[in-house]
Amino acid sequence: FLKKDDTLTIGTCDNGMYYSQAKINNKIDKSDLVIWTFKNNKIVSKNPNMYGYVRTKKPDNAIFVSCKKTISKVPGNDHTIIGAFSFKKAETFLKYSKDLIKLNKKINKEFYLDSVAKLCVSSKLTVKVNLVNKYIGWGTPTDFINNMVIKN
């Protein structure tokens, strides 16, 4: 049972990441939503429009979210959305997910949490990015094979 004041983190199952638990806890405490991101990973260059992106204002405040569309000419340098999101309160996730469905804001005929994050940013909630130390994607068979042995 999900309580409205519960902290809620939602993520995909086709990746792994290294991150600082203390850093993410601090960001969750200071924001309504944290979008988990990575940068400078060659995986993005294969199909840049397969990802979502976040434009930030220093140091880590999200000011724009794009789903399945690049935001610059060099997407590898941008905050790329991992597919993990931490909501300080579950009620924020529930409210903005319901709004997304009510507005029928689909991308490629599907609803995405990237779009929930975009609604949160446009509603002036405090949204931050959490740039992970390392991202390991295994969303495609090639990615899985290439990342079976993870090098530190």
Where are the regions a protein language model picked out?
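Conserved beta-loop-beta/alpha segment of the NTase-like Rossmann-fold superfamily
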Residues: F1-Y53
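Catalytic-core segments of class I nucleotidyltransferases/pyrophosphorylases
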Residues: N25-N26, K58-I136, T142-I145, V149-K151
